[in-house]
UniProtKB/Swiss-Prot annotation:
Alphabetically ordered keywords of this record: Cytoplasm, GTP-binding, Ligase, Magnesium, Metal-binding, Nucleotide-binding, Purine biosynthesis
Function of the protein: Plays an important role in the de novo pathway of purine nucleotide biosynthesis. Catalyzes the first committed step in the biosynthesis of AMP from IMP.
Gene: purA
GO cellular component: cytoplasm
Lineage: Bacteria, Pseudomonadati, Pseudomonadota, Gammaproteobacteria, Pseudomonadales
Protein's UniProt name: Adenylosuccinate synthetase
GO MF, one example: magnesium ion binding
Locations listed in the record: Cytoplasm
Subunit structure: Homodimer.
Amino acid sequence: MGKNVVVLGTQWGDEGKGKIVDLLTEHATAVVRYQGGHNAGHTLVIDGEKTVLHLIPSGVLREGVQCLIGNGVVVAPDALLREIIKLEEKGIPVRERLRISPSCPLILSYHVALDQAREKARGEFKIGTTGRGIGPAYEDKVARRGLRIGDLFHRERFAAKLGELLDYHNFVLVNYYKEPAIDFQKTLDECMEYADLLKPLMLDVTAALHEMRRDGKDIMFEGAQGSLLDIDHGTYPYVTSSNTTAGGIATGSGFGPMYLDYILGITKAYTTRVGSGPFPTELFDDVGAFLAKRGHEFGATTGRARRCGWFDAVILRRAIEINSISGLCLTKLDVLDGLETINICVGYENEEGAVIDAPTDADSYLGLRPVYEQMPGWSESTLGAKTLEELPAAARAYIKRVEELVGAPIDIISTGPDRNETIVLRHPFG
């Protein structure tokens, strides 16, 4: 009987999901993306060679693994095709193994224009989006006016819908944001080119997943971004536009929650965030700079510097509950090597002096102060360790304390960027 495993982020994204998905796909028949778009950036390092993926599931680098994009993913055809070509130049037969749901909403040029115009208009109050049209595409979906990949294969119907959409969005772009209009004919011609290239990749992903389930195959679901960026459960409004939590699997792929066997939560040994929004443990001192430099904390998608801070057990406890986490993978432990002391946030103190749990919206974080528990650091290197016994005693104590504070076992520890630099204590597919 097969196992169905989920890998998702438990913080604000950039936790190191790509490496772990790649590691675990050795046991998987298929890897599935179920939400987000090309705002994700999953970095894989195999034998020292770095590959960054945005839309295509991380299983693409494992020979024979099928890669599926479910209906919950918003797809920018130009970005997808660029990614396919780049991988094919490395000798990876992407088109043989990649299949996409025709129900995926399309991201087109007017979505990008709207996204960037809004961020520009917000000025210092911008959300911090990637400017890639993700939010506007999801808005069109929810408003029931969006175009899907399947619409591309019906030219007349597609052209009529596109005309209506451009009338609507161009009115806003030109009259409200004072930006240039998007050209109808140019957009239509581009889309018809996409149609010819994408048609061979179409598949009823939901039906395929259930066929695999009945056949006893092992399936992995790959989350993008992190739980604290979830549109419903994140630090609203500084969130993404999709459900990044485990609930997004059912809606984004058609695979019901009762079929899931194990949910692996990826969490850094410290905390990072890209863009705007609350971040209680953020550091503005030498330690923050140390973490950023040692951890190479720059976004794989945008190149933006990530904000860095101490590990936050409060937000992780919330993420564990929301996602029904079975076990954790602690990544970038080696980045903490050399610190004399390490702080863990165990609570938030409000202006009245009361210690409270994680708020559910951004404004409620105002005035909160992190309550820290201090632990000894270690001077020895943890880089590349493959067993728990190889780690310094202080590092093992840190891991144990994190488990105690968050109420979940740490089943995997990542000690470096390469897939081999990993300690596996309990295998999700085991």
